[in-house]
Amino acid sequence: MVVRVQLSYDRSGRGEPLVLIPGIGSRRQVWAPVLDRLKAQREVVALDLPGFGDSPIQPPPGTAAGVGSLTSLVSGFLDEMGLERPHLAGNSLGGWISLELAKLGRGRSATALSPAGFSNRREATYARVSLQLCVRIARLLEPRADRLFASPLARVLAFGQLVAHPTRMSPADSTASLRALALAPWFDETLMAAALDRFRDGEQLSVPVTIAWGEKDRLLLPRQARHAARLIPGARIVILRSCGHVPMYDDPDQVAQVLLDGSRD
């Protein structure tokens, strides 16, 4: 059964529809650095996952926090938007969800940027503990974020594990990103559920798949791209040069081109 929930989203541009899904604790505005480049050739729908960003604080009663539930909720959103088989793309957890949606036949293509779901047990523990530490720090710093991120050094210290070049984030983007992480009500439950799960059945994917990994990803290590290649026969593997886990801030041109190439018929 597909559960429906109203998600916050932005829709702009013209062309084939491309749905953008952010990662855990993130928000739809994380795609802003690549948006102008994309919407010249695609109708772009950037959404907030349930319980994150501006989407409803509480998902429907009885909804679990796992990847399967999030996939079902986003699938319901696609129905509400009249998007039968759009191109799909996502970062981190959003990349994993894009692949799951594509397995269900909900997409014409899937592009995953440093997707979650391809870690071994040790790597998954490292990522979980890292993110738990990140969110605790974010909750402590959130009341002072406006003043704090006027300093480039503060941006480096706060986002260095997620972005290869944190000073390319503006103070306003840094503040908003930290607040989105600190205030996300479904973060802890979603993180624990995702850490215990893995991507499976990649051979069921019958649409074009691109896996792009930041070569300087310090959260989900770049070597996981090799595991993704083994699990998804025929996937196009791209290494994003000089990019971290959230590559949109590091090199918008490079990332936009990967998204455009991955969403061509």
Description of each model-found segment:
Residues 107-142:
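Flexible "cap/lid" loop of the alpha/beta hydrolase fold
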Residues 183-230:
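Conserved serine/cysteine hydrolase catalytic core
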Residues 10-57:
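Conserved HGGG/HGGXW glycine-rich cap/lid loop of the alpha/beta-hydrolase fold
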Residues 90, 94, 98:
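Gly/Ala-rich beta-loop-alpha elbow adjacent to hydrolase catalytic centers
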Residues 68-86:
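Conserved acidic catalytic loop of the alpha/beta-hydrolase fold
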Residues 146-203:
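Conserved alpha/beta-hydrolase catalytic His-Asp/Glu region
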Residues 230-245:
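Catalytic histidine neighborhood in serine/cysteine hydrolases
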Residues 243-256:
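Catalytic histidine-centered segment of alpha/beta-hydrolase-like enzymes
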